[in-house]
Amino acid sequence: MNSFEPQSQDSLQRRFHQDNSTTQQPRDTTTPFIPKPASKNHNNSNSSSGAAGRSFQGFGLNVEDDLVSSVVPPVTVVLEGRSICQRISLDKHGSYQSLASALRQMFVDGADSTDDLDLSNAIPGHLIAYEDMENDLLLAGDLTWKDFVRVAKRIRILPVKGNTRQVKRNE
């Protein structure tokens, strides 16, 4: 048996108003709480630090705008011809070179060499593309890194097709 008895809404409101009756100003309980942005140096003067310097103290959190924009879900990495996909967190990488290194470790056996590694040679014989939010397939590396992290929904690793025309030799 649970000894907890639920209290009615009226008794909760009464208790809330009794607890707040000792304060100087009554609180308005009808409007929602909206955290106010504070400057980085935590004083009340208006600073021109811009959007990057704002932090929100609303719920005991100091969250930078860049941090909020970098929290993205992991994207699916699909290697054409394989039935099992991988997932990778793009916000854990700082550049295309870092992504290329991670992709090489995922899909290339014995991938120890990272000298002069970029997306064009991360996985030999393959091209690295991505799907954006509109399901367009685009070549990875065309956008700045931050924009790529923001719009990439899926990374596709496509095999490079060889010359499909075969010249017949007269022998």
Curated annotation (Swiss-Prot):
Any GO BP: auxin-activated signaling pathway
Region named Disordered: 1-51
Record keywords: Auxin signaling pathway, Nucleus, Repressor, Transcription, Transcription regulation
Compositionally skewed regions (Low complexity) per UniProt: 40-49
Gene Ontology CC: nucleus
A molecular function (GO) term: DNA-binding transcription factor activity
Bias (Polar residues): 1-11, 19-32
Limits of the PB1 domain: 72-162
Further remarks about this protein from its record: Lacks the EAR-like motif (Domain I) which is one of the conserved features of the Aux/IAA family.
Similarity annotation: Belongs to the Aux/IAA family.
Record-given protein name: Auxin-responsive protein IAA33
Gene responsible for this protein: IAA33
